[in-house]
From Swiss-Prot:
Keywords: Cytoplasm, Methyltransferase, S-adenosyl-L-methionine, Transferase, tRNA processing
Enzyme class of the recorded protein, top EC level: transferase
Organism annotation: Shewanella denitrificans (strain OS217 / ATCC BAA-1090 / DSM 15013)
Keyword Cell inner membrane appears in the UniProt entry: no
Known role: Specifically methylates the adenine in position 37 of tRNA(1)(Val) (anticodon cmo5UAC).
Identification of the protein by name: tRNA1(Val) (adenine(37)-N6)-methyltransferase
GO molecular function list: nucleic acid binding; O-methyltransferase activity; rRNA (adenine-N6,N6-)-dimethyltransferase activity; tRNA (adenine-N6)-methyltransferase activity
Annotated EC: 2.1.1.223
Length: 265
């Protein structure tokens, strides 16, 4: 299926996971406008990478990592047809292999060549990851890989974010609310902390079904606080953002976030 936004076009016909409202909301919500380097983990059709390119300055470079070959090809085609083809690099790889390749490259760099080696750290990391931890798998292996965590468990995702995020960087992901507890254990074990979280309801008045997490590195002070006082590092959650009101229209915050992307806003 094809989707036309205000500044770019997405064809996701070869992708296991189609463009979704969740993805558009994540791309619009993430506070990445000042980033100079962005990593999109599990890029799929390239939606988040293209939204990041639209929202950042011209000197921001974006890397889109996608495991599935067909999706990576679709992502590359969508990037090539966008205004930002020179700013987005598509890599057909797992994030685990990408981390290993960067580590191998770093080990081969001496002090004389370090200055010209591309940075392996990113100001911002964004991901709409596979998040179903159990339940029936899709009949399509590609769709199963895109939806279920067996290829990218939370531990691997958050360890990759920990490894690739710059010291003052920020990462934003979206998950089902039922995955929040296991995700929290995984990001804390990886050495990350919650900067903010936002619950998402599909309709005004309904219980949240998704949660957006903003993560950053633990500081030395955070570690001492946790060890010494046993206090939670998680701030209080904000009120839920609802996608549609009871009349089926976009809620005011949703409309404000997405007005630069959706044609009819």
């Amino acid at each position: 299926m094809a989707f036309t936004f205000k500044q770019f076009h997405i064809d996701d016909g070869q992708c296991a996971m189609a463009v979704s409202t969740d993805g558009v909301l994540l791309g619009a919500y993430a506070p990445l406008t000042q980033a100079k380097s962005v990593l999109d983990i599990g890029a799929g059709s390239g939606l988040l990478s293209l939204m990041a390119a639209q929202r950042t300055q011209a000197d921001c470079q974006i890397v889109a990592i996608e495991l599935d070959q067909n999706a990576a090809n679709a992502c590359q085609n969508n990037v090539n047809n966008s205004p930002w083809s020179k700013r987005i690099k598509v890599v057909n790889s797992s994030i685990q292999a990408y981390c290993d390749d960067l580590a191998s490259l770093s080990s081969q760099v001496d002090n004389q060549t370090a200055a010209i080696t591309p940075t392996s750290k990113f100001d911002y990391i964004i991901s709409n990851p596979p998040f179903f931890e159990n339940g029936p798998s899709s009949q399509s292996p590609e769709r199963a890989a895109a939806r279920h965590t067996h290829n990218l468990p939370f531990s691997a995702l958050f360890n990759a974010i920990k490894s690739l995020l710059s010291p003052l960087g920020l990462s934003t992901i979206i998950l089902p609310v039922q995955s929040l507890e296991s995700a929290t254990l995984a990001y804390q074990e990886a050495g990350l902390k919650l900067s903010c979280q936002r619950f998402i309801a599909s309709v005004q008045g309904k219980s949240p079904y998704r949660v957006i997490l903003c993560l950053q590195h633990l500081s030395a002070g955070d570690i001492l606080l946790a060890l010494g006082a046993g206090k939670s590092l998680n701030p209080l959650s904000e009120t839920s953002l609802f996608i549609r009101d009871n009349q089926g229209q976009f809620g005011p915050e949703m409309a404000s976030l997405c007005k630069d992307f959706y044609l009819k806003l």
